[in-house]
Amino acid sequence: EDIMQDGLKGMLQSKIPLGYYICHLMEEYSCENLFFYLAVEQYEHHQFETRDDQHIAAKRIYSTYIAPNSQLEINLESKIHKAIVLALLDSDSLLHVFEPAKHHVFELLNLSYHRFISSPLWDTMIAQC
């Protein structure tokens, strides 16, 4: 019900329906977008004990999702990629370092979500949940 009202934001807060959405993203070969988005959400809400801990976490997100040829590389515009690289060099601006990329990826997820609600997998989810 929340998903019907809140769309993608509701889906991201769900449990079982989110599993169906992950299956859809896997079919589209784009589940790395969701994983990145969730990693950044966790990063932004985590209370780091030290600036170094925050920097290590930011570098981990970068090396997993943003670095060229990374395991789960997301598709970003070069200007967003460059801004992240520069921000990682300046440890004073780490809190919102991924914000432009997160916004971009959310838009990609939203496009996938609209394809999902038109798919047979959506109908299966509605029937089962």
Predicted regions and their residues:
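Long, compositionally biased intrinsically disordered regulatory segments in eukaryotic proteins
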Residues: E1-C129
